[in-house]
């Protein structure tokens, strides 16, 4: 391929590319471009056309212009008003810019012009035929190019000219056209163009299919419209009503019968008017119909009549649940007030207690006792505010919130509405559902609760809301303030036994297809299951164990191994395996540095053993067992107090300087925190530093201060019941927790002895077994040591005998 060097003025093109053999009009308005054309006209009318990389650039530089362009001849020049000119140019040949001679007052470049020489072999012929065929198909489908163009293209013998003319007729991007222009080799250019035309064919075919589909849809819509208009005319002649008018009249009739509040009725009628003006097939019409259906399905004025019979309600509650005195009493109080005050708003109760104690099922029993509808929604894991208030109708697939959905499910405006697991809600970027619940659970506001979907106030003041939670400290304070909290503690052993006999056994026997004649389980056997196979505040695991016994019984009967099965304490292991827990004392022997404490979690109470040991070192204290900051600080406070009382306790000062102290609380994988183990850790430290053993049948709880005072703690009932389960006989509690002993069942108090203390000295006097404390100068009797203590008084040392508890010697 031969080439020659030429010096020509340069005309930068914006948004257009000129191929060789292409004739086109160009409107020129930039000063540099006009001067370049005028220079070409003065010389031999030859000019170099190159396209800009970015059409938006008004003052292009060397880097803004493609290097390869087209040498063209200016055929005509016409000056237009406004200082612009229009030129007719014809492309001659490809050329490449070798260098820019100057850029002012116009671009002038030295270009290398390519002349095309080729040998028309079989490959070139095949590519030409393929390209011509594809171009013919493209022209037929696109209908953008005159058919005459195909005739002129078919007769071309020069492959380069064929490619350039076809490329000039295609609607390609500037980048793709430039790619073809830069293909100097004939075969390369033909191959590229074949690929481009094939791709364009696919696009044109897709466009054709889309156009056909759209046209058919339009024809269908027009046909439907025409037929509907005809149907309207026919109905009018026959005196029949339009379907849309009939639908709207039906909605109006239903609204008038529904006894809506005034505001809701106005809103519904307004939506009916909107529906009447819409085309029946409009998407918005479906949204309005759905909205009206929701409005009509809500119980605006429907309510059930309460069964205000306290005795009957008590019978229902007692039949369904054993124990749970406080919530049952609150329900009967509500009934009594309802009988006297007819317009009383529904109470908002929050049942707080460990899992498995019957909080959720109690809500269902309350509804049965009041003869009301019952609705339950679980709030566990809810983190979207729209779950409570609903979505606005502007969203696709919008629905009311779960409160309004629950009211529709209930079908009455005064159901018992249970909000389960209210402490398990979360919040994120979508909002805070607990804040949305503030309006629902506020008696002063919920009479005008507004859902985003309904957009009109709905009265919730007659609803009896009951919420449940395992841990009330996880509930946001403003929300907790709106509810009446009722604490439900774990069941006692006797309560579990009665629940198993009255409820769990009959239920599981029936569920497993057995009869009472087929299986017998004694009370002692159930007690053994409670004591040695479960350790929980509720009865869920107990029910699972009873279910396991029933399954194995059913298997034996079906297999023909027995007609009747009797489960006793001797053969219980055949049904449940080896006991999982040891029932009896928490520790079997009196030991130095080992003390039983009491803990309270959201799943109930438990006992924990605190171990302390010493070894030679530098006086450091180590704490292990995954303890929280509060618990570590409590241990430090106890250690500081013991160190300050070393002389009175008979502890050598070297123990604090040359011996290290290690405090460990077993089950190290479980996080522990809180101040209630303060006196327990202090007692264990005093024991190991004095060498005095601690009673194994004793448990204690209480916070300690640097002065040795014992402060009150929470969860006393749960802690005491856990200690009772572990076989503890004597419990040490802060004196300020005396009021909490009233919550402990009488039968539990009869089996325990309680010591109420105000100071750690009293704790040590009770817990440490040796009778004398050796001072560095004098030996004091225990009583004398206690009386010499300025923190101790006769009132402080009082011992509370609870329901037959025996007094231990001090």
Curated annotation (Swiss-Prot):
Residues 589-770 form the Lon proteolytic domain. The keyword Hydrolase applies. It is an enzyme of class 3 (hydrolase). ATP binds at residues 353-360. Its main location: cytoplasm. Residues 8-201 form the Lon N-terminal domain. Its EC number is 3.4.21.53. It is found in: Cytoplasm. InterPro entries: AAA+_ATPase (IPR003593), ATPase_AAA_core (IPR003959), Lon_bac (IPR027543), Lon_bac/euk-typ (IPR004815), Lon_lid (IPR054594), Lon_proteolytic (IPR008269), Lon_Prtase (IPR027065), Lon_prtase_N (IPR003111). GO terms for cellular component: cytoplasm. The keyword Hydrolase applies. Induction: By heat shock. ATP-dependent serine protease that mediates the selective degradation of mutant and abnormal proteins as well as certain short-lived regulatory proteins. Required for cellular homeostasis and for survival from DNA damage and developmental changes induced by stress. Degrades polypeptides processively to yield small peptide fragments that are 5 to 10 amino acids long. Binds to DNA in a double-stranded, site-specific manner. PANTHER family: ATP DEPENDENT LON PROTEASE FAMILY MEMBER. Homohexamer. Organized in a ring with a central cavity. This is Lon protease. The lineage of its organism: Bacteria, Bacillati, Bacillota, Clostridia, Eubacteriales.
């Amino acid at each position: 391929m031969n080439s020659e060097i030429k010096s020509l003025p340069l005309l930068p093109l914006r948004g257009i590319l000129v191929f060789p053999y292409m004739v086109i009009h160009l409107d020129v308005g930039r000063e540099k471009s006009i001067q370049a054309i005028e220079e070409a006209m003065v010389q031999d009318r030859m000019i170099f056309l190159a396209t800009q990389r970015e059409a938006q650039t008004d003052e292009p530089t060397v880097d803004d212009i493609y290097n390869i362009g087209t040498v063209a001849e200016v055929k005509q020049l016409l000056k237009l008003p406004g200082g612009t000119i229009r030129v007719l140019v014809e492309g001659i040949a490809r050329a490449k810019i070798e260098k820019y001679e100057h850029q002012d007052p116009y671009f002038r470049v030295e270009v290398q012009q390519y002349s095309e020489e080729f040998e028309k072999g079989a490959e070139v012929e095949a590519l030409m035929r393929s390209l011509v065929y594809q171009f013919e198909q493209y022209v037929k489908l696109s209908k953008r190019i005159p058919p005459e163009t195909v005739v002129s293209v078919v007769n071309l013998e020069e492959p380069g000219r064929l490619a350039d003319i076809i490329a000039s007729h295609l609607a390609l991007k500037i980048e793709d056209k430039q790619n073809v222009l830069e293909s100097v080799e004939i075969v390369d250019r033909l191959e590229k163009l074949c690929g481009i035309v094939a791709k364009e064919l696919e696009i044109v075919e897709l466009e054709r299919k889309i156009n056909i589909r759209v046209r058919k849809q339009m024809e269908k819509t027009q046909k439907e419209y025409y037929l509907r208009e005809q149907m309207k005319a026919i109905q009018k002649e026959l005196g029949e009503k339009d379907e849309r008018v009939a639908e709207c009249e039906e909605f109006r009739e239903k609204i008038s019968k529904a006894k809506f509040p005034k505001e809701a009725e106005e809103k519904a009628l307004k939506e009916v008017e909107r529906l009447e003006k819409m085309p029946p097939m409009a998407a918005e019409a479906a949204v309005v119909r759905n909205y009206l259906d929701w409005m009509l399905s809500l119980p605006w004025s429907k309510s059930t009549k309460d069964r205000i019979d306290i005795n009957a309600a008590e019978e229902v509650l007692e039949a369904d649940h054993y124990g749970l005195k406080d919530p049952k009493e609150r329900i009967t109080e509500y009934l009594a007030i309802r009988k006297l005050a007819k317009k009383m708003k529904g109470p908002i109760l929050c049942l707080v207690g460990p899992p498995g104690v019957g909080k959720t099922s109690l809500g269902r029993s309350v509804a049965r006792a009041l003869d009301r509808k019952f609705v339950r929604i679980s709030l566990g894991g809810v983190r979207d505010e729209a779950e409570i208030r609903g979505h606005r109708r502007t969203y696709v697939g919008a629905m009311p919130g779960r409160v309004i959905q629950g009211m529709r499910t209930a079908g009455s405006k005064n159901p018992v509405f249970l909000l389960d697991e209210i402490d398990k809600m979360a919040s994120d970027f979508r909002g805070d559902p607990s804040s949305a619940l503030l309006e629902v659970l506020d008696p002063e506001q919920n009479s005008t609760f507004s859902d985003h979907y309904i957009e009109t106030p709905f009265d919730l003041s007659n609803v009896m809301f009951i919420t449940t939670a395992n841990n009330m400290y996880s509930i946001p304070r403003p929300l907790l303030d709106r509810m009446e909290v009722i604490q439900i503690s774990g069941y006692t052993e006797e309560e579990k036994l009665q629940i198993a006999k009255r409820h769990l056994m009959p239920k599981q026997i029936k569920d497993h297809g057995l009869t009472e004649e087929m299986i017998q389980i004694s009370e002692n056997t159930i007690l053994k299951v409670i004591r040695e196979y479960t350790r929980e505040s509720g009865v869920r695991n107990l029910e699972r164990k009873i279910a396991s016994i029933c399954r194995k019984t059913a298997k034996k009967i079906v297999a023909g191994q027995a007609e009747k099965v009797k489960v006793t304490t001797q053969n219980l292991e055949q049904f449940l395996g080896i006991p999982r827990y040891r029932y009896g004392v928490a520790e079997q022997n009196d030991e130095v540095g080992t003390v039983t404490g009491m803990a309270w979690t959201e799943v109930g109470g438990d006992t924990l053993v605190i171990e302390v040991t010493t070894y030679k070192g530098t006086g450091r204290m180590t704490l292990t067992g995954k303890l929280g900051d509060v618990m570590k600080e409590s241990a430090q406070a106890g250690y500081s107090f013991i160190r300050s009382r070393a002389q009175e306790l008979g502890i050598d000062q070297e123990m604090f300087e040359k011996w290290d102290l290690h405090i460990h609380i077993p089950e190290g994988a479980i996080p522990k925190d809180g101040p209630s183990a303060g006196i327990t850790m202090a007692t264990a430290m005093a024991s190991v530093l004095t060498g005095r053993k601690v009673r194994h049948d004793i448990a204690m709880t209480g916070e300690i201060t640097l002065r040795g005072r014992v402060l009150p703690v929470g969860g006393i009932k749960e802690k005491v019941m856990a200690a009772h389960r572990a076989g503890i006989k004597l419990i040490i509690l802060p004196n300020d927790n005396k009021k909490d002993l009233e919550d402990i069942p009488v039968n539990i108090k009869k089996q325990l002895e309680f010591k109420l203390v105000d100071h750690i000295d009293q704790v040590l006097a009770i817990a440490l077994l040796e009778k004398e404390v050796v001072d560095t100068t004098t030996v004091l009797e225990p009583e004398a040591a206690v009386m010499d203590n300025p923190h101790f008084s006769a009132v402080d040392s009082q011992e509370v005998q609870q329901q037959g508890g025996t007094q231990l010697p001090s």
